[in-house]
């Protein structure tokens, strides 16, 4: 059998199937299997840390062919390695195979299986397996229940998860901080913060002291739900209980404050970190740089950027892009380009967001040609433009009167639909607005017709753009006809549509019609 295993891998290597074959050096390492009569126990003891998936499957095959059969303990060691590779369905199938062969599970194997059911989004199977475990005489422990409850959380079955916690307590199994932390973290990551807080209170009632990991999970969850005030209160309660926050705890709240426009609070938290001798990391600095940029304080953002380097925290592409974005928003595109070049000199390549930010920046200062050069540079470097890149570039070209170039870019997008950059409704709206803005109504109507042929979901924004274009071109009668047809299309005019139409009527001297439409707008409750 061992020789057959060895020969199998040698054949794979000879055939050039390097993806499935073991490396030659690894093959030589495995030759001791033959010399030592395939001592799988030695392999289990020494070789699992570097085992690849295909190797693990081959080892399992070898083990089931061995006589006498290995113990369930040995099999479980291997199954645990496969589970760590996130091959949960494979573990479940291999366990079924063992049962068919008459190899009985132990509690550790049952817990491993329970976890695999849950991680592969099959909590209903995990729940029924719990009953099977108990029939086999295994008493579920805290590991069993932690896996099962976590599985219910991952499957958004919150009532069952909470019920399982109560059932566990009734069975005399005392929850510990690890179990609560695992479940609370899962709840927070899936947006069930209220359930997490309820569980947190329950834990306190059982006299279990929370740790920094649990607090950080809750702070993160609250911040992600927009409840930064509650997160801040939780942080204060944490410090009062002499539980020291870590950099991840502070980062969650600093980032939340920045996004809420509470930059002074974010700065105060940063200063508090320093006072507590908690070293900021790149995420901390990047959040603060974003905050300075949002406040228009780009010089302070740059100072923070260089302070980061002096602290041994070297900026990555995200940090550079944040600073570039700040300068672009302040229309200091030359400074933004200097930062971009500095980033390149340090061996960092801008990503799609970096280039899109620069394209938008040059568009806003009326430099469409430079924006297009940046786009060309992006493509030549192999950085893939996404739909937002194209939309930003189209807006830049149209806004600056480069309609022909915009149409060329649009046609390029249509050709590259298979690359995942097909025009979306926003692309069409940008182009339609640009064409109408530049007096190209006929071309706009052709593009609009293309949208209809593609059976796109045309909404009120698109119709309003066309109505505005018609009014601008003096085609008010056409605009009125299109406006009146909206109800039959299932589209309701908004205040912008009404205002556009009323203004168009006034410009044509149709004051009575404009007043009638104004009254209708009021009657329809549009404001």
Swiss-Prot record:
Transit peptide, residues from-to: 1-35
Pfam families: PPR_1 (PF12854), PPR_2 (PF13041)
UniProt PPR repeat ranges: 36-70, 71-105, 106-140, 141-175, 176-210, 211-245, 246-280, 281-315, 316-350, 351-385, 386-420, 424-458, 459-493, 494-527
Presence of the UniProt keyword Transit peptide in the record: yes
Keywords, alphabetical: Mitochondrion, Repeat, Transit peptide
Superkingdom of the organism of origin: Eukaryota
Chief location of this protein within or outside the cell: mitochondrion
Record localization: Mitochondrion
GO annotation, cellular component aspect: mitochondrion
Family: Belongs to the PPR family. P subfamily.
Protein name as catalogued: Pentatricopeptide repeat-containing protein At5g41170, mitochondrial
Organism for this UniProt entry: Arabidopsis thaliana (Mouse-ear cress)
């Amino acid at each position: 059998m061992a020789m057959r295993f060895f020969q199998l891998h040698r054949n794979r290597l000879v055939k050039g199937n390097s993806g499935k074959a073991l490396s030659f050096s690894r093959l030589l390492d495995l030759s001791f299997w033959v010399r030592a009569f395939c001592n799988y126990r030695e392999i289990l003891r020494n070789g699992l840390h570097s085992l690849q998936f295909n190797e693990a499957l081959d080892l399992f095959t070898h083990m089931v062919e061995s006589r006498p059969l290995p113990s369930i303990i040995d099999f479980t060691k291997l199954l645990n390695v496969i589970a760590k590779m996130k091959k949960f369905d494979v573990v479940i199938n291999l366990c079924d195979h063992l049962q068919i062969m008459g190899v009985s599970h132990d509690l550790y194997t049952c817990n491993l299986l329970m976890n695999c059911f849950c991680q592969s989004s099959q909590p209903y199977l995990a729940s029924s397996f719990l009953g099977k475990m108990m029939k086999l005489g295994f008493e579920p422990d805290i590991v069993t229940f932690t896996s099962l409850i976590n599985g219910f959380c991952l499957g958004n079955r919150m009532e069952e998860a909470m019920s399982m916690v109560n059932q566990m307590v009734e069975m005399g199994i005392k929850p510990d901080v690890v179990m609560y932390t695992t479940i609370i973290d899962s709840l927070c990551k899936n947006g069930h913060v209220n359930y997490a807080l309820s569980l947190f209170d329950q834990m306190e009632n059982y006299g279990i002291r929370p740790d920094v990991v649990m607090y950080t999970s809750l702070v993160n969850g609250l911040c992600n739900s927009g409840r930064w005030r509650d997160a801040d209160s939780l942080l204060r309660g944490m410090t009062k209980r002499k539980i020291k926050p870590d950099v991840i705890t502070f980062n969650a709240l600093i980032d939340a404050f920045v996004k809420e426009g509470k930059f002074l609070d974010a700065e105060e938290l940063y200063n508090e970190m320093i006072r507590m001798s908690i070293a900021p990391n790149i995420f901390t600095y990047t959040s603060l740089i974003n905050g300075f940029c949002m406040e228009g304080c780009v010089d302070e953002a740059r100072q923070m950027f260089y302070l980061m380097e002096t602290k041994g925290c070297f900026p990555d592409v995200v940090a550079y892009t944040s600073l570039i974005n700040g300068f672009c928003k302040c229309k200091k595109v030359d400074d933004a380009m200097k930062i971009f070049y500095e980033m390149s000199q340090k061996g960092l390549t801008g990503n799609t967001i970096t280039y899109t930010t620069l394209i938008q920046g040059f568009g806003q200062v009326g430099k469409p040609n430079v924006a297009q050069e940046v786009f060309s540079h992006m493509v030549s470097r192999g950085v893939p433009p996404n739909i937002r890149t194209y939309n930003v570039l189209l807006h830049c070209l149209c806004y600056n009167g480069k309609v022909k170039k915009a149409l060329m870019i649009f046609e390029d997008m249509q050709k590259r639909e298979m690359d995942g950059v097909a025009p979306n409704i926003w692309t069409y709206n940008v182009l339609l607005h640009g064409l109408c803005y530049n007096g190209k109504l006929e071309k706009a109507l052709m593009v609009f017709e293309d949208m209809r042929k593609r059976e796109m979901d045309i909404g009120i924004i698109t119709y309003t753009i066309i109505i505005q274009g018609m009014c601008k071109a003096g085609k008010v009668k056409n605009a009125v006809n299109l406006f009146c047809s909206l109800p039959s299309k299932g589209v309701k005019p908004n205040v912008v549509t009404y205002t556009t139409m009323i203004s168009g009527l006034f410009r044509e001297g149709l004051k009575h019609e404009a007043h009638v439409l104004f009254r209708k707008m009021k009657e329809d409750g549009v404001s």
